[in-house]
Regions:
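Structural signature of PLP-dependent enzymes
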Residues: 273-290, 294, 301-326
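PLP-dependent enzyme catalytic core of the Aspartate aminotransferase-like
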Residues: 94, 124, 360, 364-373, ...
Length: 410
């Protein structure tokens, strides 16, 4: 018999979001008349922008003609026109088109990057953070076994991101030659790294031989012009950082699947070889390129009309976040000492429930309010006693959920 990959034995029991779905199903089964509203998983709910739909429709129709048909590209990095538009529109020329690698989404890029870097790399993650950073590292053999305390993995450096440090980590505990995972705007906290924060990060990475994997999937939600949307706004970042981006949340492509990562030409491994060359070999071997239909939609999303229409949807979600933040300021939450954190630049509201376990709060909100949330403990040890509320939802549902939450008793 073929042996199971030992790395998978080290995974913690259950991935966060399937566990949430399981508890929701069980509650629904025992309460069949309950109308459950989800403020949990970050899946978009609003329709694609009309301009994007028309572009994808036109492309699909062209595929039905001899003149318009095309198969996969010779280069798995994406259509040249889309790579150039990303470089021009998103990065204002800070990076070049050959440094853009179009993909089927940031999550997929994360998995391929983790495979490329392999088991012999040190890992540092924000705590709390998107679970894929840790779970993917475990699968790649870079995390070791679960710590004896049951909190985290032995070979991962957890960088606490708490209200006390403005949700940006102290880098002093990070070992040299580490992969440093940073997400801004952050999932789950919603915090955005400042220019000073990222300058410190870049300086640390360059000094200590680290590579930053910078997840900027929510950058389109930033409304404060003083906050950086890309790590490449910081001098020296091209020598130490890979940035991952996505059309999923800003353009509603969670089901369409389209994203990209930037691998600068200046970024090198210890032996002086270019990371971009290894990444090119990686994707040409293990990936055949993003869907041509999705790429047609991506081109439309980044022209003037597409940007205007997607901004309207982003604003809609940000307004939902404001409604959730308002609901968490009601008397019952104040009496319980609940503190919501949200700067208005992300589709999430992160709330502290002092003295309570986050899964207990999750269960209380589900049972009393019939609202699904996300327990902070699922994002890492420092997420305990926090709850993440997602603003991805229809307005009427968000408003109704807010009303129900005002009756929560803890």
């Amino acid at each position: 018999m073929i042996r199971r990959n030992n790395n998978f034995k080290n995974l913690a029991k259950g991935y966060l979001f399937p566990e949430i779905a399981k508890r929701r199903r069980e509650f629904q089964a025992s309460h069949p008349d309950a109308h459950i509203i989800s403020l949990g998983i970050g899946n978009t709910t609003e329709p694609l922008a009309p301009h994007i739909v028309e572009a994808m429709k036109s492309y699909v129709e062209a595929l039905g003609t001899p003149e318009g048909y095309e198969g996969y590209q010779d280069d798995s990095a994406g259509k040249p026109a889309l790579r150039q538009r990303i470089a021009d529109v998103v990065y204002s020329g800070r990076i070049t088109a050959d440094e853009v690698f179009v993909s089927d989404g940031a999550k997929c890029d994360l998995g391929r990057l983790q495979f490329m870097f392999g088991a012999g790399v040190r890992v540092a993650v924000q705590d709390p953070s998107y679970p894929v950073y840790v779970d993917g590292s475990v699968m790649a053999g870079a995390a070791g076994r679960e710590a004896a305390t049951g909190k985290g993995f032995a070979d991962i450096t957890y960088m606490p991101c708490l209200p006390e440090n403005g949700f940006f980590p102290d880098l002093s505990a990070v070992k040299s030659d580490s992969l440093i995972y940073i997400c801004s705007p952050n999932n789950p906290t919603g915090a955005v790294a400042t220019r000073d924060n990222l300058s410190q990060l870049v300086s640390f990475a360059r000094t200590n031989g680290c590579i930053v994997l910078f997840d900027a999937a929510y950058s389109a939600f930033i409304r404060d012009d003083s906050l950086p949307k890309s790590i490449y706004e910081i001098e020296g970042a091209k020598e130490c950082a890979i940035e991952m981006q996505s059309f999923s949340k800003p353009a509603g492509f969670t089901g369409v699947r389209l994203g990209w990562c930037v691998v600068p030409q200046q970024l090198v491994f210890e032996d002086g070889s270019k990371v971009a060359d290894t990444w090119t070999r990686m994707i040409n071997t293990a990936f055949n390129g993003a869907s041509n239909v999705a790429q047609a939609g991506g081109l439309a999303a980044l022209d003037d009309v597409g940007q205007r229409q997607t901004k309207e949807t982003i604003d809609y979600y940000l307004e939902n976040a404001a409604l959730i933040r308002e609901a968490l300021g009601s008397a019952n939450f104040k009496a319980a000492g609940v503190i919501p954190y949200s700067g208005g630049n992300a589709p999430y509201v992160w709330a502290a429930f002092p003295g309570h376990k986050s899964w207990d709060v999750f269960d209380a909100i589900l049972s009393q309010c019939h609202v699904v949330t996300t327990p902070g403990a699922g994002f890492g040890p420092s997420g305990e006693s926090f709850i993440r509320f997602s603003a991805f939802g229809q307005r009427e549902s968000v408003q109704e959920a807010g009303g129900r939450l005002s009756h929560l008793e803890l």
